[in-house]
Structures are given as structure tokens and as C-alpha cells.
Amino acid sequence: MPRVKGGTVTRRRRKKILKLAKGYFGSKHRLYKVANQQVMKSLMYAYRDRRQRKRDFRKLWITRINAAARMNGLSYSRLMHGLKLAGIEVNRKMLADLAVNDAAAFTQLANIAKENLNK
């Protein structure tokens, strides 16, 4: 009985890695060994940055809210505290969207926060 060396399995595995490495520069998309290393690293970056993206967006929203709050005479922390005292539960994503796209509505929320801080 002839010996089976698993050539089709190996070829399939290598083709899968080279397919994932499509678009990489130079030997990183041509040579299996280099491509495999780069694909593993790329998957690690992707895993890490899916979590980092959530933090980055939260930072962006807070920066936008803070800028709009200061235009209304409040700091970010005082605005958020005032809204909490007023019982207004609006998340940072929506607040940042209001700050950018609907300044009048954001100003109303800032005024409500000011009133509740002064009580």
C-alpha cells in the first residue's frame, strides 16, 4: 500500500493562510512562512483593536461633549452630574451626537443640568 503524505491537507492549509495574506506587501503575501507570521500578528492586532475601538469612541464622545459643555459654561463632569441629578438618562453617544448636530437641544440639556446643580 502506498504511503500517504497529506499533500492536499497541507496545500489547503497553506492556501488558506496565503488567501488571508492577500494585499500584504512583498513577501508577506507570497511566502508561506512569512505570510503565516504576518497573518497571526494581524489577527492579534484585530482582536486587540476591536476592544480598543470601543474605548476610542468613548474618548471621542467625551471630548465632544466637554467642548460643547464648555461653550455653555459647564465642564463635562458638572454637566454629567447635573443631568444625573435631573434624572435624565442619555448616553454619551447620543449627547455627543446632539452636541455636533443639534446645538439647540444640547443647550437645553445644559441649562437643565445647570438648574439642577444650583438646587
Swiss-Prot record:
> What's in the GO CC field?
ribonucleoprotein complex; ribosome
- Could you give a single Gene Ontology term from the biological process aspect? ribosomal large subunit assembly
For this UniProt record, give its keywords in alphabetical order, as a comma-separated list.
Answer: Ribonucleoprotein, Ribosomal protein, RNA-binding, rRNA-binding
Q: List the disulfide bonds.
A: none
Q: Which domain of life is it from?
A: Bacteria
CDD domains for the chain: Ribosomal_L20
Q: Which PROSITE patterns does the UniProt record give?
A: RIBOSOMAL_L20 (PS00937)
Pfam families assigned to the protein according to its UniProt record, in alphabetical order: Ribosomal_L20
Which GO terms of the molecular function aspect are on file? rRNA binding; structural constituent of ribosome
Q: Which InterPro entries match?
A: Ribosomal_bL20, RIBOSOMAL_L20_CS, Ribosomal_protein_bL20_C
Described purpose of this protein according to its UniProt entry: Binds directly to 23S ribosomal RNA and is necessary for the in vitro assembly process of the 50S ribosomal subunit. It is not involved in the protein synthesizing functions of that subunit.
State the family it belongs to.
Answer: Belongs to the bacterial ribosomal protein bL20 family.
Under the heading NCBIfam families, the entry gives: rplT_bact (TIGR01032)
Annotated protein name in UniProt: Large ribosomal subunit protein bL20
Which organism's genome codes for this protein? Answer: Anoxybacillus flavithermus (strain DSM 21510 / WK1)
